């Protein structure tokens, strides 16, 4: 069952261009280094907040990624632009059209 990581964070307005520049390298590092990484979407919210929606093939893939942290330069550069972690959640994506 696909696992969805929801991470909400705050970025100071002057840091937004650097965050967006770092995103490409972060995603490249995820594709190269994170087994089970499927997709990521970045959403801008009010009050200088952002929501990163990342889809993993399995919960174990997400857990392994979390354990690695910012182990590569592109990931570290993206994380460096974050002023504050607001919240983080994990959920599952149910099959469409199936009960349960």
Model-flagged regions — what are they?
Residues 25-38, 55-90:
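An amphipathic, aromatic/His-enriched active-site/gating alpha helix that lines ligand/cofactor pockets
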Residues 2-10, 38-68:
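Short, well-ordered beta-strand segments in beta-rich or mixed alpha/beta enzyme
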Residues 12-14, 59, 99:
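Generic structural motif
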Residues 91-100:
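Short, low-order "capping/linker" segments at domain edges
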Residues 10-21:
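Short, surface-exposed ligand-recognition loops at beta-strand->loop->(often short) alpha-helix junctions
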Residues 47, 74, 95-96:
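Generic low-complexity segments that are intrinsically disordered, proline-rich and/or Lys/Arg-biased
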């Amino acid at each position: 069952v696909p696992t969805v990581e929801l991470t909400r964070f705050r970025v100071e307005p002057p840091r937004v261009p650097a965050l967006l520049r770092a995103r490409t390298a972060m995603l490249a590092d995820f594709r190269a280094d994170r087994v089970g990484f499927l997709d990521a979407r970045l959403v801008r919210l009010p009050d200088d907040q952002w929501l990163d929606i990342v889809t993993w093939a399995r919960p174990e893939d997400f857990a392994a990624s979390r354990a690695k942290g910012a182990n590569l330069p592109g990931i570290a550069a993206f994380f460096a632009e974050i002023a504050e972690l607001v919240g983080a959640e994990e959920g599952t994506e149910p099959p469409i059209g199936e009960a349960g």
